[in-house]
Amino acid sequence: MPTVLRVGRYRFFFFSNESEEPAHIHVKAGGDEAKFWLEPVVLAVSYGFNSRELSELEELVMNHRSEFLEAWNEYFS
């Protein structure tokens, strides 16, 4: 489960067995978790985060999208 980025309490990562899915990033903080598709950036699923946190996470994903895609492509190619 490669961690790509940490920002505050948020950890951005993907699972090493998810190469068959489109590029995406998971975000975890404590017991809360979300998954964002990267092309385009869209929330796929969320458990525990409130709407304010999801807005913040979406902005972080958009700001680091190229970094996440680069990590994804390097890992799975």
Regions found by a protein language model. Name each.
Residues 4, 43-45, 64:
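Generic preference for hydrophobic/aromatic residues in regular secondary structure cores
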Residues 8, 45-47, 73:
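Intrinsically disordered, low-complexity segments enriched in small/polar residues
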Residues 11-13:
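Feature detects long, helix-prone N-terminal segments enriched in hydrophobes
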